[in-house]
UniProtKB/Swiss-Prot annotation:
GO cellular component: cytosol
Enzyme Commission number: 2.1.2.1
Gene: glyA
Name by which UniProt lists this protein: Serine hydroxymethyltransferase
Organism taxonomic ancestry: Bacteria, Bacillati, Cyanobacteriota, Cyanophyceae, Synechococcales
Cofactor(s) annotated in UniProt: pyridoxal 5'-phosphate
Coiled-coil ranges per UniProt: none
Localization of this protein: Cytoplasm
Function: Catalyzes the reversible interconversion of serine and glycine with tetrahydrofolate (THF) serving as the one-carbon carrier. This reaction serves as the major source of one-carbon groups required for the biosynthesis of purines, thymidylate, methionine, and other important biomolecules. Also exhibits THF-independent aldolase activity toward beta-hydroxyamino acids, producing glycine and aldehydes, via a retro-aldol mechanism.
Length: 423
């Protein structure tokens, strides 16, 4: 059964658009920090007949018949997730990281309770109490940021805020923080004020799984994550904790609390991705992700472009473009013109609006999946610097695009293994 050939026959418009997106991915340098390239096996699992199956409830406790095989699949996904993160309990049903966070909030909080998370403009996430998100509308959200001098977490300041506001839940884990998170210090603050502690490790899950970043499981009451980004699986969510009885609360908050039927085709793809991440070569991949980020950061610094916090400990490199008198909006456009995909991003204490910003966020997970190494990332950094430092030079723009295409040809995506219908 050739699903892609069937698609080409039944809906050539969608087939052609998928083909266009595949070609875009092949010919661009993907540096969006929240993106990665799933394996063929992951994509095949999520494109399988499992999409036909409804399975409300948990394995062995379904509200529908015919679930014997999806039960086995989901149980395998749960066990692999637990093994991967040294957890005692896992729920693999959340459709996204945001859904996972919502389920945790439903379990632990009542409307009006105080939550303490990082300010979005300092590297937090919408679901950590932003006023435009449900988390900021239903709860009394207060925020901490980074130190103005170091752009790193200052636990003395965070402790003072927690003591003054007495949050019921403290959230750590970020979308644009390039440094190691000290979960033990957060645990100490949470204990002092009597708060629950939640870690959202969506960006660093793959590094945690590879034991290249501290594991939050021993310190946090609950851990949420996405399953893509550095974990390199399908788009989806995951909840983990060390207390099985506590975990039962989250089970009920996922279903029936915030979701109906689980997406068993995505859960199968999660199981495949977790299995891949349990292999020794995934640790090597994660090591290269961090190494590449450090190389990219140092290359840009050497060209006179400031990096928030002076470097990185993970996959994120956050450029502070005030050092070259440029906005994130302009930089995003400039690199896109030479086939580099990134995103404008606020930096701590940013004078610009979120629609303009002073930063550009880069990530190394996707290109590392393509096989990019230290040498390749030096070239990536040089191309970015050449483009940003010479925004009006059309010759340099042309040369930068040619260099990008040369890199793409040197590190092909999927190595032409996709079906011919989308080649």
């Amino acid at each position: 059964m050739n699903i892609l050939q069937n698609l080409k026959k039944s809906d050539p418009i969608i087939s052609n658009l998928i083909n266009s997106e595949k070609n875009r991915q092949e010919t661009h340098l993907e540096l969006i920090a929240s993106e990665n390239f799933a394996s063929m096996a992951v994509m095949q699992a999520q494109g399988s007949v499992l999409t036909n199956k409804y399975a409300e409830g948990l394995p062995q406790k379904r509200y529908y018949g015919g679930c014997e095989f999806v039960d086995e699949i989901e149980e395998l996904a749960i066990e692999r997730a637990k093994q991967l993160f040294d957890a005692d309990w896992a729920n693999v049903q959340p459709h996204s990281g945001a859904q996972a966070n919502a389920a945790v909030f439903l379990s632990l909080l009542n409307p009006g309770d105080t939550i303490l998370g990082m300010d979005l403009s300092h590297g937090g996430h919408l679901t950590h109490g932003s006023p435009v998100n449900m988390s900021g509308k239903w709860f009394n959200a207060v925020h901490y940021g980074v130190d103005k001098e170091t752009n790193k977490l200052n636990f003395n300041v965070i402790r003072d805020i927690a003591l003054a506001t007495k949050p019921k839940l403290i959230i750590c884990g970020y979308s644009a923080y390039p440094r190691t998170i000290d979960f033990k210090s957060f645990r100490s603050i949470a204990d002092e004020v009597g708060a629950f502690l939640m870690a959202d490790i969506a960006h660093i899950a793959g590094l945690v799984a590879s034991k290249l970043h501290p594991n939050p499981i021993p310190y946090c009451d609950v851990v949420t994550t996405t399953t893509h980004k550095t974990l390199r699986g399908p788009r989806g969510g995951l909840i983990l904790c060390k207390d099985k009885e506590f975990g039962k609360k989250f089970d009920k908050s996922v279903f029936p609390g915030t979701q109906g039927g689980p997406l068993e085709h995505i859960i199968a793809a999660k199981a495949v991705a977790f299995g891949e991440a349990l292999q020794p070569n995934f640790v090597n991949y994660s090591k290269q992700v961090i190494k590449n980020a450090k190389v990219l950061s140092s290359t840009l610094i050497n060209r006179g472009i400031d990096i928030v916090s002076g470097g990185t400990d993970n996959h994120i490199v956050l450029l502070d473009l005030r050092s070259i008198n440029m906005t994130g909006k302009v930089a995003d456009l400039l690199v896109s013109e030479v086939n580099i995909t990134a995103n404008k991003n606020t930096v701590p204490f940013d004078p610009e609006s979120p629609f303009v910003t002073s930063g550009l966020r880069l990530g190394t997970a996707a290109l590392t999946t393509r096989g990019f190494n230290d040498e390749a990332f030096i070239e990536v950094g040089e191309i970015i610097a050449d483009r940003l430092l010479n925004p009006d030079d059309l010759l340099i723009e042309k040369e930068c695009k040619e260099r990008v295409l040369s890199l793409c040809n040197s590190f092909p995506l999927y190595e032409a293994k996709l079906e011919s219908s989308i080649k």
